[in-house]
């Protein structure tokens, strides 16, 4: 068996290079055909869309994009008062029917309730937007208790997987879509976000695998936004990283990009799009990205984590 690995180590590099040279033109052609296909935009008028974390941030503004196109909305979050405001705004923007379902995505029974109430009210489900999430603003060793990290994984990862589990039978019937809001930190490490980054990376790998399992019945779009001006960029977060240091994008612009990606059936939405090039550098020359992150941490961030 070791001999087989030795042979593969020797053969695969030249074979891979040859493959890329020979088939790259064909790849470009298929990408062009894919772009032409994406000129078609899905009509979401009358479609039923369930959005978690809809009380603020990306979830709120994605709801507004759907509302403008006449979609019917089921809005989920813990803050009922905020949901009511988002629901009313969505109605004014053009949504014909909006319900709110307060609850916690980290609770399995609540996740079942979200789906059950949506089906009871609308009779179907077309799109599931997994957006609910919480941030992290301390380095790993500065957690007061390690158990405090559990809630990040429970909400950011398990919250999306729980509700997806209950939604799949209904999405199969409607040939629907699942959208998951991950983060650029799933690919590029961010200081003081170790558990947060892990939760977002877990989302990417889970839904990439699920995409294989449930295709072609259900389509999956994975969004990887960078720094976005939402409630998650808390005053503590902005103070730590510095408002000038963070190249934050408006939440409305990000939501529009995600909505366009959903409508075009894109597998991934990376916003802002320049982050794609950082991902490329990370894949080709990971040491360069690691060096830059180390430099940024030592030069800008380390003073915030010094202990008494």
From Swiss-Prot:
Transmembrane portions of the chain: 10-30
Molecular function per GO: oxidoreductase activity
Active site: 196
Sites where the protein binds substrate: 183
Subcellular location, principal: membrane
Binding site for NADP(+): 53-79, 104, 196-200
Pfam families found in the cross-reference section: adh_short
Enzyme Commission number: 1.1.1.-
Membrane-topology descriptor: Single-pass type II membrane protein
InterPro entries attached to this UniProt entry: NAD(P)-bd_dom_sf (IPR036291), SDR_fam (IPR002347)
Entry-linked SUPFAM superfamilies: NAD(P)-binding Rossmann-fold domains
GO terms classed as biological process: steroid biosynthetic process
UniProt keyword annotations, A-Z: Lipid biosynthesis, Lipid metabolism, Membrane, NADP, Oxidoreductase, Signal-anchor, Steroid biosynthesis, Transmembrane, Transmembrane helix
Subcellular location: Membrane
GO cellular component labels: membrane
Signal sequence annotation: none
Family indicated by similarity: Belongs to the short-chain dehydrogenases/reductases (SDR) family.
NCBIfam families attached to this UniProt entry: PRK06181.1 (NF004825)
Name of the protein in its database record: 11-beta-hydroxysteroid dehydrogenase-like 2
């Amino acid at each position: 068996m070791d001999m087989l690995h030795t042979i593969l180590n020797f053969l695969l590099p030249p074979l891979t290079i040859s493959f890329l040279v020979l088939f790259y033109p064909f790849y470009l052609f298929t990408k062009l055909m894919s772009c032409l296909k994406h000129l078609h935009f899905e009509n979401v008028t009358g479609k039923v869309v369930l959005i978690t974390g809809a009380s603020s941030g990306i979830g709120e503004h994605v709801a507004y994009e759907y509302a403008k196109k006449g979609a019917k909305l089921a809005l989920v979050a813990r803050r009922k008062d905020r949901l009511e405001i988002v629901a009313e705004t969505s109605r004014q923007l053009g949504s014909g029917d909006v319900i709110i379902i307060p609850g916690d995505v980290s609770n399995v029974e609540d996740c079942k309730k979200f789906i059950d109430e949506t089906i009871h009210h609308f009779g179907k489900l077309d799109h599931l937007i997994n957006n609910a999430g919480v941030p992290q603003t301390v380095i790993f060793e500065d957690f007061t208790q390690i158990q405090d990290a559990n809630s990040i994984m429970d909400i950011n990862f398990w919250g999306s997987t729980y509700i997806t589990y209950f939604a799949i039978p209904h999405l199969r019937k409607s040939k629907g879509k699942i959208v998951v809001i991950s983060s650029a930190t799933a690919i590029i490490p961010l200081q003081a976000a170790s558990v947060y980054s892990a939760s977002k990376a877990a989302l990417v790998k889970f839904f990439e695998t699920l995409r294989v399992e449930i295709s072609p019945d259900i389509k999956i779009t994975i969004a990887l936004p960078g720094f976005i001006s939402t409630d998650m960029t808390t005053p503590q977060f902005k103070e730590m990283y510095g408002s000038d240091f963070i190249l934050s994008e408006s939440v409305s612009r990000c939501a529009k990009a995600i909505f366009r990606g959903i409508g075009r059936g894109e597998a991934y939405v990376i916003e802002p799009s320049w982050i794609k090039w950082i991902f490329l550098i990370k894949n080709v020359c990971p040491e360069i990205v690691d060096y830059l992150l180390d430099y940024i941490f030592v030069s800008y961030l380390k003073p915030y984590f010094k202990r008494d």
